Curated annotation (Swiss-Prot):
Catalytic activity: orotidine 5'-phosphate + H(+) = UMP + CO2
Transmembrane segment boundaries: none
Pathway involvement of the protein, from the record: Pyrimidine metabolism; UMP biosynthesis via de novo pathway; UMP from orotate: step 2/2
Record-given protein name: Orotidine 5'-phosphate decarboxylase
Enzyme category, top tier: lyase
Amino acid sequence: MTFLDMLRNATAQNQSMLCVGLDPEPSRFPAAMRGDASKIYDFCAAIVDATADLVNSFKPQIAYFAAHRAEDQLEKLMAHMRAVAPHVPIILDAKRGDIGSTAEQYAKEAFERYGADAVTLSPFMGFDSITPYLQYEGKGAFLLCRTSNPGGDDLQAQRLADLPGQPHLFEHVARLAQGPWNTNGQLGLVVGATRPQEIERVREFAPSLPLLIPGVGAQGGDAVATVKAARIGGGPIIINSSRAVLYASQGDDFAAAARTAAQATRQTLQDAAAA
């Protein structure tokens, strides 16, 4: 089954647009685990177990594991997610971007070592830095397009004077991803929830692509405006929440609190879709 098929099935089965991001920070763990990087797997597995029926995807952020020499725990977590939620796709948040020969190794890491269903990438180095990932049939690749961080304006909002209509860089990325780069229907886009009007603009260029949308929750994105904008064109929607779910409680009830937070976010997104 392809990543896109898995995403659509999980969205329907769990009635959810919610992605839970797995960004483990040991300093924020419950008291019994706090500061202990060897407990990263235990913490994340408990979150997965508590939310697996509420999400359409999980998104482990590789830096939060690598910084603590916890790649082995990430491998174990990937296997656990496969066992307890085989219908839920896993997006490895790596934001890789490098020349083709190096990209081949990053693709091997994402899809062979970790067994991810999709990966996040930077398109800055062009199509030949993306193609090694697309060699993995059925896997997904999300290109950074219009991100939620303030510094995204430095490059993404700049206009390309040499192209017809002088599009913004993020608009050009969306056009390429919808069109000539999407040779096997594997691409999606990362678009931040803090700029709903620009999600609408992205949808003009990429109506059918899946959108991975961080920024709802801790980053302050408006759920109703985000869902309304993302639904234009009918492409799949993945709305990520990380900290608001992971750290809903720093007590022993952290997993139950994470479930409650995920339920509330899923309901908010469902209400937004119905508005």
